[in-house]
């Protein structure tokens, strides 16, 4: 681990060192739990830049370290009024490998920093879950598909342009096994039956079902 500069600098050498440091930290996070927990917590609390802080937070989430919840709460408490910074936090929450990630995402729909009227928040939470957490989105029970159907139903009237982009993971059904294709097709049929279905959604849904 290199010794950080006392002052954050955007120099090629410093950027390279941060990149290497954070790659090493992520590998270490999957090693001995106590040591990983200490190292990740230390980097998060001593970080003098967002890159290092987010790298520590990401490692804690990916490896499901004991410090994860406390660090996520600290980040939330500090940055909840900064939407763009919180987008990073929502993405980490939505792409977590935790078994209860869908439950977490549903709960975050009520978070103080989240709103269905902001496309960036929608993409960072709902979009990240559907598009960047395949294990959870494609759960065998179809719960991920049903969640997206609920969100798209809301957005169909609220913001059809955003809905049209969010549906992408659901219309790629032909890439998956027969069981998942069946559930994805059922989800698309459910959306197709909506009253006042937007033109953009209708076009994508009918093409996927053809």
PLM feature spans:
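Long, ordered, helix-rich scaffold segments
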Residues: 3-210
